[in-house]
Amino acid sequence: MEAVSSEYYFPLYSALGYFALVFGIGEIARIITAKYVSPRGNSQLFLYELIGTIQMCTCVYENGIIFKNYGFPAIFICVALLLTAGNIFNRGAMTNCAPIFEQFVFGNLGSSKFLTILSAQLIGATFASKFAYLIWNITAPYSTAHLENASNLECILHYKQTAGIVIGFEIVGAFVVRIVVAQLLARPALIKLIPFAISAYLSLALYVVGVPGLNPIVATARLYGCRGIDNSSFFILYWFCPVLGWLTGAYVVGQKSPSKKSAKDVKAEKKAKAAAKKSD
């Protein structure tokens, strides 16, 4: 009984070691970046985003082990904790293109920084699979779960619903998540629940649809090139749909462009400038 019990937790130990290694390497890379790369310009911003994206997308590859061996409750907790850890360690890296599209569209992010962040995310998504398989191959002699993953190069997407429902789920899901995030951000005591809210949606999508999206960068890293969906459908489903839902949610919660300030805001700014001049 004791032997069976210990074997049951072997995949968990493998996953925890994997996550610790990925975050450890990521943190070392961030420390080196902070020490040797100037915060002036976009170089440090690019590297932080690149490191964070590789780190988070590489961790997504290991989530399959958690779900396969421990089911929905475990994957919910796992994703929530990974997102929480990302918020702590990632130095502000977004690792998701939907928020930067939002900031750019509403005029809160310049084109230079927008392209810097987006290019870092795309490059990071490209390299995530290589890092995941590298770790699996190195640790395969010590982990049956990693040995199985390292030897399995086939990726097939299985959807539980029709195309229309899957598309609707992506749009509505991103819309709802954006609104929920806004509500939690408005209450400082509840901000820490944001990763759990996102994880709850992803777990629900996994149960209902079979292949969750929400984050186009993560979807690209993990799902692009898999059998079961062509390239055009992939970009519609995992890029256009979630970004559309996210931007719609941002519009509903009142994301404002700097060029569309209210008369009250403009008046307050003028008073502040006048007061500043008097103090000079």
Swiss-Prot record:
Keyword Chloroplast: no
Membrane topology: Multi-pass membrane protein
Superkingdom of this protein's organism: Eukaryota
Single GO term (MF): channel activity
InterPro entries: AQP11/12_channel, Aquaporin-like, Aquaporin_11/12, Invert_Aqp-10
Ranges of the Extracellular topological domain: 30-64, 136-164, 215-233
GO cellular component, one term: membrane
Keywords: Membrane, Transmembrane, Transmembrane helix
Location(s) in or outside the cell: Membrane
Topology, Cytoplasmic side: 1-8, 86-114, 186-193, 255-280
A single GO BP: innate immune response
Spans through the membrane: 9-29, 65-85, 115-135, 165-185, 194-214, 234-254
Region span, Disordered: 256-280
Compositional bias of kind Basic and acidic residues: 262-280
PANTHER family: AQUAPORIN
Protein family membership: Belongs to the MIP/aquaporin (TC 1.A.8) family.
Protein name, entry field: Putative aquaporin-10
Organism of derivation: Caenorhabditis elegans
Gene field: aqp-10
